[in-house]
């Protein structure tokens, strides 16, 4: 289960709406399973159908996470025209060529903008190509 403070879910939805019609992406970091920082990451694809995180952003974020002794807890992105469920592309991007997970402990948070007046947000694990929905508790 992932527990997420309301202001983080609000920020994810706001980010998605601001980037619409393109997908947004970002990272949640923290300690002991508790999110303490949300990082918006530039989607270098500038696409409504896919995202790729800017490598320069990732270098800065990874350094700050290491310096703060945090963990990468979740990766988030939006789906602008489909449900909040990992696509085949999302699964492929979450795995190495040998099929093993790149971040097996990380949650993947997806926000769907199919209904922009009421976006849907869900959390998943993607482990070795298998998707499992996880409870997302907003506090």
Q: Locations of the language-model features?
A:
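Conserved beta-strand-loop surface patch within small alpha/beta domains used
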Residues: 1-72, 83-139
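Histidine-centered divalent metal-coordination motifs
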Residues: 77-81
